[in-house]
Amino acid sequence: MTDPIADMLTRLRNAVSAKLTRVDIPASRLKADIARILQDEGYIQGFKLLDDAGQPAAPVKTLRVFLKYGPHGERIITGIERISRPGRRVYFGRDDVPDVLAGLGTSILTTSRGVMTGREAAKVGVGGEVLCNIW
């Protein structure tokens, strides 16, 4: 797999389209940071890091994401878009961090201070690589 972040986003997109309650994704620290941001922003209910047997453990292999839906079953995540790819990296300076849908969505950046949303990066005054947009 050449782009594990795109794989994570595709699994989330497909799971939401299929109205699943959870989705299992191969784990990494970057993916866990992205899941933390999605939880903090209210796009998912939560996530757990699991070993191969499905139990919480030290050698993490799987990231289990619990999806969130509205009171009538409507999607909370309506769109996910990968921005920076391995073949074409996209960076923004601290003054150029983009808004997603005029502030209705969230951009996720990796910066020198860690993974954060576009709003947090603009507030702190750092730029970075834009991983994805979600709305």
Locate each region found by the language model:
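Core subunits and conserved enzymes of cellular information-processing
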Residues: M1-W135
